[in-house]
C-alpha cells in the first residue's frame, strides 16, 4: 500500500479558507496576525544551506569532543576520493612498495617514507606478496605495528598471483587466493586487508572460481573489497557478470599504469566501466618508472633504477628512438612546470590527479626528498586548468579517443 506524505507545498495556506464576508474576513485576519504560525515539524524540512549545515555539524561534534578543524583533511590538505563507487575513502595519493621496500632502500628509510606519507594525510599503502619475495609486506606490517597507528585510519592493499615456486603457489585458484592471502596477513601482522587485488588475469582458472574465492575471503573477514590489476576491460566485465549472476561480490577497482605516455586504458576503457558497473581506477607509475623525473635526459645515471641488471628493459626503453622522443617532449613541458612554480615530477603527478576518474595515484619513492616533492603535487592540482591541460596535450600529441568521440 502506498502511503502519501504531503510536502510543505501541498498544505493549503490558512488564507485560502477565509470567509467571503468582509467583516468576518477582517476578524480572521486579525486573529491570524496574533496567532503563531503552524509548526514546521509536520512538513519535510528544507535542506539547510551549506554554512548552516556546517554550523549544525560543528555544534553536534563539539558535544562529543570532536572538531572539524582537527580532521586529517583539514590539517594536511590531502584530498580524498571514493574508491570507484564503493564507500571506501582513499587519499588521492598513496604510497607503493614495489622495488623500494625490501630491496632498493633500508628498513629505516622505509619507516621514514611511511611516516612522511602518513603525517601528510596519506592513508593508502599498497604492497604485494611478490614484492621482494614477501619481504615488502613484512617491512610494511612491522612499521605499522611499531608506529602504533590506528588500523581504522589506514587502507592497506595487497596483490596475489606469484606466491612461490610451487605450481600451487601461484595463480588465482581458490587454493592460492585463500592460502596466499593468509600468508600475506601473517607477514603484515594484520587481521585483514582493505583491498585484495588479483595481480594479473589467470587463464588457467575459471572466472567463477576466482570470484567465488574473492567473495569467500571477504565474507570471512580477511578483506573488505577485492579488485583487479592489469586486467582487460572485457575480463573485468566478465567478473562483474559472474558476480551478479551468482549473487557474489564484484571487483571495485582496477590497478592500471597511467602517466603522460600511457593513457588509453585509464582515459577510455575504465571510465566506461566506472559508469556501467562502478569499477574505479587506482593508478601506478605516474613518473613512468622514473623516465618523467628528468634524470634520464642525458643518459642513464649509475645510481638510477635503469642501471640495475634486472631493469635492462627500462634502460632499453630509455635509449630507444621512442625514448629519445619522450625526453624531447619532457623538455618542452619544463617551461609549463616553471610557469606553474613546480617541478616536472610534480606536474606529472598533478596531471594524473586532474583526471577525476582516478581514485588514487600510487607513488614510489626511494628517498624522503623524492616523496616530499611528489606529495607537493597536491598544491599544483588547482593550477591544472583546462588551458594548461590543452597545452600539455598539444605537446604530447597522444590523447586517446573513444568510439563515442568519433561518433559525436
Curated annotation (Swiss-Prot):
Family matches, as Pfam families: Aldo_ket_red (PF00248)
Active site feature: 131
GO CC annotation: cytoplasmic side of plasma membrane; cytosol; juxtaparanode region of axon; potassium channel complex; voltage-gated potassium channel complex
Tissue-wise expression: Expression most abundant in aorta. Also high in left ventricle. Also detected in right ventricle, atrium, brain, skeletal muscle and kidney. Not detected in liver.
Name of the encoding gene: KCNAB1
One Gene Ontology term from the biological process aspect of the record: regulation of delayed rectifier potassium channel activity
Organism this protein belongs to: Mustela putorius (European polecat)
Superkingdom to which the source organism belongs: Eukaryota
InterPro entries given in the database record: K_chnl_volt-dep_bsu_KCNAB, K_chnl_volt-dep_bsu_KCNAB-rel, K_chnl_volt-dep_bsu_KCNAB1, NADP_OxRdtase_dom, NADP_OxRdtase_dom_sf
Entries under CDD domains matching the protein: AKR_KCAB1B_AKR6A3-like
Free-text note regarding domains: The N-terminal domain of the beta subunit mediates closure of delayed rectifier potassium channels by physically obstructing the pore.
Membrane topology: Peripheral membrane protein
The protein's name in its UniProt record: Voltage-gated potassium channel subunit beta-1
UniProt GO MF annotations: aldo-keto reductase (NADPH) activity; carbonyl reductase (NADPH) activity; NADPH binding; potassium channel regulator activity; transmembrane transporter binding; voltage-gated potassium channel activity
Compartments, as annotated in UniProt: Cytoplasm; Membrane; Cell membrane
Catalytic activity as recorded in UniProt: a primary alcohol + NADP(+) = an aldehyde + NADPH + H(+); a secondary alcohol + NADP(+) = a ketone + NADPH + H(+)
Enzyme class name: oxidoreductase
Subunit structure and binding partners: Homotetramer. Interaction with tetrameric potassium channel alpha subunits gives rise to a heterooctamer. Identified in potassium channel complexes containing KCNA1, KCNA2, KCNA4, KCNA5, KCNA6, KCNAB1 and KCNAB2. Part of a complex containing KCNA1, KCNA4 and LGI1; interaction with LGI1 inhibits down-regulation of KCNA1 channel activity. Interacts with the dimer formed by GNB1 and GNG2; this enhances KCNA1 binding. Interacts with SQSTM1.
Gene3D superfamilies linked to this entry: NADP-dependent oxidoreductase domain
EC number, UniProt record: 1.1.1.-
Family statement drawn from the similarity comment of this UniProt entry: Belongs to the shaker potassium channel beta subunit family.
Sorted UniProt keywords: Cell membrane, Cytoplasm, Ion transport, Membrane, NADP, Oxidoreductase, Potassium, Potassium transport, Transport
Amino acid at each position: 500500500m502506498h502511503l502519501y506524505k504531503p510536502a510543505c507545498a501541498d498544505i493549503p495556506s490558512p488564507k485560502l479558507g477565509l470567509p467571503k464576508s468582509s467583516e468576518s474576513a477582517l476578524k480572521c485576519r486579525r486573529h491570524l496576525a496574533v496567532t503563531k504560525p503552524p509548526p514546521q515539524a509536520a512538513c519535510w524540512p528544507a535542506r539547510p544551506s551549506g554554512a548552516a549545515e556546517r554550523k549544525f555539524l560543528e555544534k553536534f561534534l563539539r558535544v562529543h569532543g570532536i572538531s572539524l578543524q582537527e580532521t586529517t583533511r583539514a590539517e594536511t590538505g590531502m584530498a580524498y576520493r571514493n574508491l570507484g563507487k564503493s564507500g571506501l575513502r582513499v587519499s588521492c595519493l598513496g604510497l607503493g612498495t614495489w622495488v623500494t621496500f625490501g630491496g632498493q632502500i633500508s628498513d629505516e628509510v622505509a619507516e621514514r617514507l611511511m611516516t612522511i606519507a602518513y603525517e601528510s594525510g596519506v592513508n593508502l599503502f599498497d604492497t604485494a606478496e611478490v614484492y621482494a619475495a614477501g619481504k615488502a609486506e613484512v617491512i610494511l606490517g612491522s612499521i605499522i605495528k611499531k608506529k602504533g597507528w590506528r588500523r581504522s585510519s589506514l587502507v592497506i592493499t595487497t596483490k596475489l598471483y606469484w606466491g612461490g615456486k610451487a605450481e600451487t603457489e601461484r595463480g588465482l585458484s581458490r587454493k592460492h587466493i585463500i592460502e596466499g592471502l593468509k600468508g600475506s596477513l601473517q607477514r603484515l601482522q594484520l587481521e585483514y586487508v582493505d583491498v585484495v587485488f588479483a595481480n594479473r588475469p589467470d587463464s588457467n582458472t575459471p572466472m567463477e572460481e576466482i570470484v567465488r574465492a574473492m567473495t569467500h575471503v571477504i565474507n570471512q573477514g580477511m578483506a573488505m573489497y577485492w579488485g583487479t590489476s592489469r586486467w582487460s576491460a572485457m575480463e573485468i566485465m566478465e567478473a562483474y557478470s559472474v558476480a551478479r549472476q551468482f549473487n557474489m561480490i564484484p571487483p571495485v577497482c582496477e590497478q592500471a599504469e597511467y602517466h603522460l605516455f600511457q593513457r588509453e586504458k585509464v582515459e577510455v576503457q575504465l571510465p566506461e566501466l566506472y559508469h556501467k558497473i562502478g569499477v574505479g581506477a587506482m593508478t601506478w607509475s605516474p613518473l613512468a618508472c622514473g623516465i618523467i623525473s628528468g634524470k634520464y635526459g642525458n643518459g642513464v645515471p649509475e645510481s638510477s633504477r635503469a642501471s640495475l641488471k634486472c631493469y635492462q628493459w627500462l634502460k632499453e626503453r630509455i635509449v630507444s628512438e621512442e625514448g629519445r622522443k619522450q625526453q624531447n617532449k619532457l623538455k618542452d613541458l619544463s617551461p609549463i612546470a616553471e610557469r606553474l612554480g613546480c617541478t616536472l615530477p610534480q606536474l606529472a603527478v598533478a596531471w594524473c590527479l586532474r583526471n577525476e576518474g582516478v581514485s588514487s595515484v600510487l607513488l614510489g619513492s626511494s628517498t624522503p626528498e623524492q616523496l616530499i616533492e611528489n606529495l607537493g603535487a597536491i598544491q599544483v592540482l588547482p593550477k591544472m586548468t583546462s588551458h594548461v591541460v590543452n597545452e600539455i596535450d598539444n605537446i604530447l600529441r597522444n590523447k586517446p579517443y573513444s568510439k563515442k568521440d568519433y561518433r559525436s
